């Protein structure tokens, strides 16, 4: 096989240059420094890194246990533990090397005013884009209500759109009746991109104590178990987003290059990696190599040629 065929993994995402379609997902890499302690790890192996969810005021997070392993993934109920936006902007962001990759903020809140204020603070920071977490299932207020109500989702997006010129990425919840309607409303409200899916709500039980494993009772299920659901949702949302030129980050259970390729073919422009980092902190170079090999094998010059290339049965 001729391996001299030039290929590119670069992606133009909302006007931002991603050197690869891989995106490290919020909550899995701390504030961009967590995995830099691992020998061989580099943020440069990802097109973007989405920082840990940030709220207006500091949050202590949920009581333990916060994580539970499942047969094909994991449950987490961290509860958005973070030091608050003031500390993130003033103390944490200055420590990041913004030449490594595109660092994006992740904004959470219990009220629309919370979302607006945190977005406003990040607008005056060096982050490349802002992701709105309106779909977090780990807390008892805020995220679930916003993410599962298309009208409320649109109100959050519109309010944040009014206070930032940076690209807005809206993270969609799979725990709703019609994700396409939410996608449509968020696009109309001013979202530049959509990321999906967030975790699905689930629980685990300790049969000896007959108590929930998680201190919060319920948590977000991630990992390979949700990949088939995520792929379907990405395909459905892509049908809504494509006519408007809206970019998509597809995510949910990516562990192999084949997984990443499926999301691209389903309609994603970029592919999120989260739980896969726990299996293998050095997963990104392997995914990049696998995607590049696929492009070589199929004589494609750019990874962008894969986006939305799904061939449906007639």
Predicted regions and their residues:
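Active-site metal-binding loops of divalent metal-dependent hydrolases
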Residues: 27-28, 252-254
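Alpha/beta enzyme core
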Residues: 43, 110-249, 255-262, 266-268
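Short secondary-structure boundary segments
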Residues: 52-54, 134, 198-199, 275-276
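N-terminal capping/small domains of soluble enzymes
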Residues: 1-103, 109
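Alpha/beta catalytic cores of nucleotide-metabolism and tRNA/nucleoside-modifying enzymes
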Residues: 1-5, 221-246, 255-314
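Short glycine-centered, acidic/aromatic-flanked micro-motifs in structured strand/loop junctions
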Residues: 26, 107, 134, 172, ...
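Short, charged, surface-exposed secondary-structure boundary motifs
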Residues: 58-62, 204-206, 281-284
């Amino acid at each position: 096989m001729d391996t001299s065929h030039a290929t590119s993994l670069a992606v133009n995402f909302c006007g931002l240059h991603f050197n690869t379609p891989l995106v490290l997902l919020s909550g899995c890499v701390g504030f961009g420094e967590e995995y830099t302690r691992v020998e061989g790890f580099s943020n440069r192996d990802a097109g973007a890194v989405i920082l840990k969810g940030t709220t207006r005021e500091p949050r202590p997070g949920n009581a333990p246990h916060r994580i539970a392993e499942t047969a094909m993934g994991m449950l987490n109920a961290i509860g958005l533990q973070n030091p608050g936006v003031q500390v993130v902007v003033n103390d944490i962001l200055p420590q990041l090397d913004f030449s490594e990759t595109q660092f994006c903020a992740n904004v959470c809140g219990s009220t629309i005013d919370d979302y607006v204020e945190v977005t406003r603070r990040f607008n005056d920071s060096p982050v490349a884009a802002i992701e709105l977490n309106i779909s977090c299932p780990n807390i008892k207020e805020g995220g679930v209500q916003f993410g599962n109500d298309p009208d409320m989702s649109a109100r959050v997006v519109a309010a944040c759109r009014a206070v930032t010129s940076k690209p807005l990425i809206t993270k969609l919840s799979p725990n709703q009746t019609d994700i396409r309607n939410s996608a449509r409303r968020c696009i109309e409200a001013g979202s530049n991109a959509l990321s999906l899916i967030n975790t699905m709500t689930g629980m685990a039980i300790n049969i000896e104590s007959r108590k929930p494993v998680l201190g919060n009772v319920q948590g977000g299920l991630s990992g390979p178990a949700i990949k088939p659901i995520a792929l379907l949702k990405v395909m459905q949302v892509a049908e809504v987003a494509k006519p408007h030129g809206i970019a998509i980050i597809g995510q949910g259970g990516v562990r192999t290059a084949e997984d990443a390729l499926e999301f691209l073919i389903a309609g994603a422009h970029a592919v999120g990696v989260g739980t896969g980092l726990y299996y293998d902190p050095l997963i990104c170079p392997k995914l990049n190599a696998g995607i590049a090999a696929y492009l070589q094998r199929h004589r494609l010059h750019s990874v962008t040629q894969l986006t939305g290339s799904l061939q449906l049965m007639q």
